[in-house]
Amino acid sequence: MTIQILPPQLANQIAAGEVVERPASVIKELVENSLDAGATRVDIEIEKGGSKLIKIHDNGSGISKEDLGLALSRHATSKLSSLDDLDAILSFGFRGEALASISSVSRLTLTSRTADQVEAWQAYAEGSDMAVKVIPAAHPVGSTVEAVDLFFNTPARRRFLKSDKTEFTHIDEWLKRIALVRSDIHFTLKHNGKVVRNYRATNTQDQYLQRLAQISGKKFAEQAIEINCQHDDLKLTGYVQSPFFETPASDTQYFYVNGRLVRDRLVNHAVRQAFAEHETGEQASYVLMLELDPHQVDVNVHPAKHEVRFHQSRYVHDYIFQALQSALHQVGRLAIDSDNKLDTDSHSQSHERGHSAYGVAEPSHSRHDYSHQTAPSTKASTETNRERFSSPISAVPSHTSDVQSRGGATSSYRQQAELPSAAAIASYAELLKTPDVDQGNRGNKELQANVSMPPILAGQYWVLTQEEQLLLLPVRIISTWLLQHEISNKLDSGLVSQPLLMPVSISMDETWSDTLAERELLLRKIGIEVTIRLGQLIIKKVPPYLRQSQLVAVIPDLLQWLRFEEPSNEALASWLAKHDDKRFESAPDTWLAFSQLDDNVQDELIKKAKVLPWQSWLEEYPSD
């Protein structure tokens, strides 16, 4: 067959394979066009799960008659005109493919009117050349897109559609996602003539929490902690599930970048790492929105725009992690410290003035500001947060509101639940902590009191004397050796595995399957549990030494190492210790463990110290 240019309709149908996967993807493209047009209300009507009819009506700016013919053409868009525009794109659409692709696999009509037009116009494409016809019509300001009989001319694609109920579920799920980030828009969804969703526009935080409860459930809205912080051009807002509840509030896990819902491994890792020490064995729920300079993120890396690429990925990762970690720590301290101070009188006063999570009473004039209520032990951390970010993190349970603080009525879903006791909170918080690797060598207060630690220089070097020598012994060298020795002793019986809060998914390398099969017992011995699913390596459990490491980089490095050799216990212990040198993170703890070693072991480790030439200094600077 000779090379030939494809007919326009066939080319559009091929392109539709990426853009139009199912009715939900059609609605996604059309509604996003409505939002780009400045609509404040979007009405969605479908029949038979969207396979029979999809109709989107909005009150946006509309399309002029002159542009209507181009609207159904490929690569025609009003969103950008140069490569510089693409580097700073903030609109949902920008490729100019959606309408052309949808019209090639359905009977599509586009009716629109602008504010300065007297009459509306309707456009539709017909024939193999996809010629666009424009005729007069009656329509208010805005646009209506109607797609009938989806995949009517591509029966193979139509056979892949699921049941009407399943397709509706996908549509409903997508609408929830967009309704959470665009709370300023009024959305309605009608299925088979019946209104099934009605999300009214919100103007206040109280109204947004009502939408949050409507979409993600009452339980999540009651437990949610508000996140609101900014640093330079990065801003993170939203809600996360409180770590002090054993069961997941919902299966809500939405992350938005500049208003666009994305799935990103870097983001997932940052969230998982922030929740690591609060692990409940279930996945945390969250609705988070990241805003940043559009020049710092590339949204043109996925056909459906579900993925993005950050130019400074590590910076973004650390920012998200620190913001969430600080918020969770602040709430944890308030939950325990403040609850211990409550008595019967303060508890009764909390009902008069309004109260926030875990029984922390809030004055009537306060709104999401705990900066003056924090216990003394929390003050330093709060100040650190204020130095790190240009505005403090508002880590406040969502059911504290202006309405409550003014003594007014509140929605039923935000009524205060029975609070756990201080002892219950404290004991549960202790359970949430990552177990110590060796609790026997920690917290021995009596032994620590009897052991005198030598002077320490810059918090990193002990100053020792041995005969006529003055030595500098690095704390890190000793802490690393102690950890390596500890791991080595435990490897014979195998390390304890800890389940991850959220399993980590990594794209499979073709060489990993053989390595996983050959080293299965070894991986199990060091506490790593993985599975393979749909071309992805799913990391489910790791030893405590790897909990804070970058698993997306560490595990591939480990598999590459295991591919060529079977390391000894000493080598494995050294590798694990290298990825967790925080076991003896304080000099007193490290010295306490060091002092319990045999004398000959201590002597060998002291040989790693640096000798200071103090005699030559005295000769160079003699005393008068």
Curated annotation (Swiss-Prot):
Question: Which intervals of the chain are annotated as region Disordered?
Answer: 340-415
UniProtKB keywords: DNA damage, DNA repair
Which portions of the chain have biased composition (kind: Basic and acidic residues)?
A: 340-355
User: Would you indicate the residue range of the signal peptide?
Assistant: none
Gene Ontology biological process terms, A to Z:
mismatch repair
DNA repair as UniProt keyword: yes
Q: Which Gene3D superfamilies match?
A: 3.30.230.10, Histidine kinase-like ATPase, C-terminal domain, MutL, C-terminal domain, dimerisation subdomain, MutL, C-terminal domain, regulatory subdomain
What does the record give under GO molecular function?
ATP binding; ATP hydrolysis activity; ATP-dependent DNA damage sensor activity; mismatched DNA binding
Q: One of this protein's Pfam families, by short name?
A: MutL_C
The UniProt entry, under PROSITE patterns, shows: DNA_MISMATCH_REPAIR_1
Cite the record's Polar residues compositional bias ranges. Answer: 372-383, 391-415
Gene Ontology annotations for the cellular component aspect, listed alphabetically: mismatch repair complex
General function of this protein = This protein is involved in the repair of mismatches in DNA. It is required for dam-dependent methyl-directed DNA mismatch repair. May act as a 'molecular matchmaker', a protein that promotes the formation of a stable complex between two or more DNA-binding proteins in an ATP-dependent manner without itself being part of a final effector complex.
Family the entry assigns: Belongs to the DNA mismatch repair MutL/HexB family.
Xref: NCBIfam families: mutl, PRK00095.1-1
Q: What is this protein called?
A: DNA mismatch repair protein MutL
Species of the source:
Shewanella sediminis (strain HAW-EB3)
Query: What is the organism lineage in this UniProt record?
Result: Bacteria, Pseudomonadati, Pseudomonadota, Gammaproteobacteria, Alteromonadales
- Its gene is mutL
